[in-house]
């Protein structure tokens, strides 16, 4: 039986279809969920990229106060896997499920390009299919992706070169319990060679490995 996964769709989400497709071709049974839905039936919850509520106030700030946020927090407490990609990462930060802050890129510009990353930690549900120290290539697309380290964090991914001014070139972090992962790069956009590369596939393969252990 395929693990059930869901993609939370906010007003302004624009990577929900990419996330759904990545799940579908990597062994999951995906569903879209809305802001009034329950999350009890899912083993993996993805908060996708985009511009939820137009990034008003701050990116992710309004979405973090939606009704679905209670369901996400409850799922996190129960140990379910949650992955926030780009705007989804911003939402998890705003909810307090991940440490730190995400501010405007140091360049003041929106950055959209493929970047090189280093897998700093492969002992996670999201990266166990990688080798520690493995160099991978995944695209980014954000204007507010500069990670500010407020406390000690479990760094999972790091940019090889500084791309947005993030502290210590941090690209992705994990919560203390190990079940909530936030990252600015888009693994769902790197699952097929046809569209530029498939290093992102290993993220979904890692989750599958973990759920089927």
Curated annotation (Swiss-Prot):
The active site is at residues 86, 186, 188. It catalyses: N(2)-formyl-N(1)-(5-phospho-beta-D-ribosyl)glycinamide + L-glutamine + ATP + H2O = 2-formamido-N(1)-(5-O-phospho-beta-D-ribosyl)acetamidine + L-glutamate + ADP + phosphate + H(+); L-glutamine + H2O = L-glutamate + NH4(+). Disulfide bonds: none annotated. Coiled coil: none annotated. It is found in: Cytoplasm. Pfam families: GATase_5. Residues 5-213 form the Glutamine amidotransferase type-1 domain. GO terms for biological process: 'de novo' IMP biosynthetic process. InterPro entries: Class_I_gatase-like (IPR029062), PRibForGlyAmidine_synth_PurQ (IPR010075). Pathway: Purine metabolism; IMP biosynthesis via de novo pathway; 5-amino-1-(5-phospho-D-ribosyl)imidazole from N(2)-formyl-N(1)-(5-phospho-D-ribosyl)glycinamide: step 1/2. One of its GO terms (molecular function) is ATP binding. GO terms for cellular component: cytoplasm. Its EC number is 6.3.5.3, 3.5.1.2. Keywords: ATP-binding, Cytoplasm, Glutamine amidotransferase, Hydrolase, Ligase, Nucleotide-binding, Purine biosynthesis. Part of the phosphoribosylformylglycinamidine synthase complex involved in the purines biosynthetic pathway. Catalyzes the ATP-dependent conversion of formylglycinamide ribonucleotide (FGAR) and glutamine to yield formylglycinamidine ribonucleotide (FGAM) and glutamate. The FGAM synthase complex is composed of three subunits. PurQ produces an ammonia molecule by converting glutamine to glutamate. PurL transfers the ammonia molecule to FGAR to form FGAM in an ATP-dependent manner. Part of the FGAM synthase complex composed of 1 PurL, 1 PurQ and 2 PurS subunits. This is Phosphoribosylformylglycinamidine synthase subunit PurQ. It comes from Thermotoga maritima (strain ATCC 43589 / DSM 3109 / JCM 10099 / NBRC 100826 / MSB8). The lineage of its organism: Bacteria, Thermotogati, Thermotogota, Thermotogae, Thermotogales.
């Amino acid at each position: 039986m395929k693990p059930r996964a869901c993609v939370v769709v906010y007003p302004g989400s624009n990577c929900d279809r990419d996330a759904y497709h990545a799940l579908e071709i990597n062994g999951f049974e995906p569903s879209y969920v809305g802001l009034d839905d329950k999350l009890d039936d899912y083993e993996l919850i993805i908060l996708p990229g985009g511009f939820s509520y137009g990034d008003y106030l701050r990116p992710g700030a309004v979405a973090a106060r939606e009704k679905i946020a209670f369901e996400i927090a409850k799922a996190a407490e129960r140990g379910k896997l949650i992955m926030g990609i780009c705007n989804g990462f911003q939402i998890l930060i705003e909810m307090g499920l991940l440490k730190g802050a995400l501010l405007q890129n140091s360049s003041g510009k929106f950055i959209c390009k493929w970047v090189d990353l280093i897998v700093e930690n492969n002992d996670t549900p999201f990266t166990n299919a990688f080798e520690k120290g493995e160099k991978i290539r995944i695209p980014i697309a954000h204007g507010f992706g500069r990670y500010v380290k407020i406390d000690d964090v479990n760094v999972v991914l790091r940019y090889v070169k500084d791309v947005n001014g993030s502290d210590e070139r941090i690209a992705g972090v994990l919560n203390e319990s190990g079940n909530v992962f936030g990252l600015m790069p888009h693994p769902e956009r790197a699952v097929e060679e046809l569209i530029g590369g498939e290093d992102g596939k290993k993220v979904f393969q890692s989750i599958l490995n973990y759920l089927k252990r």
